Structures are given as C-alpha cells and as structure tokens.
C-alpha cells in the first residue's frame, strides 16, 4: 500500500517517500512531511546548485551548504537559485 503524506512543500496530500532520504533529524522530517514529487523537484534543484557552484561533494563545506539548502527548500524561504536559470514556460 502506498504511504501518503500531507506534503509541506506542495501543500497537498501526495505519495510519500519509501524511506528517509538523509540521515538524522532532517531526513526524518523530510520522510514524514515531503512527497516523492517534491523530493524529485529538490533533486533537480540540487543538481543545478552543484553544477552552477562547482561544488565538490568531498568538501565538508559543500555538503553543509547543500544540507542548509535542502532545509530551506522544504521548510524555509526556498533554496538559492542557480544564477542565470530561467524556468521553462508553462503551456
């Protein structure tokens, strides 16, 4: 049976994640209140941030930056945007 959550990011009930995507308290929060759809949106955003900022994921500072961006994306004012990124037109 599919696990449903009230997705904080999307503001609607949607299919939940199968397991916590990150260790620790943030992973637990995401698992409990973020949908698969919103998580996929974050993965795209995260990829843009890594590429645009040329983050080296072996660097603890880069990982810390991404964890802060993850929390802001789901539970705060929104993550940083890649400079020069223009979302595709809807239609």
From Swiss-Prot:
GO terms for biological process: cellular response to oxidative stress. Belongs to the Fe(2+)-trafficking protein family. GO terms for cellular component: cytosol. GO terms for molecular function: iron ion binding. The lineage of its organism: Bacteria, Pseudomonadati, Pseudomonadota, Betaproteobacteria, Burkholderiales. Keywords: Iron. This is Probable Fe(2+)-trafficking protein. Could be a mediator in iron transactions between iron acquisition and iron-requiring processes, such as synthesis and/or repair of Fe-S clusters in biosynthetic enzymes. Pfam families: Iron_traffic (PF04362). Coiled coil: none annotated.
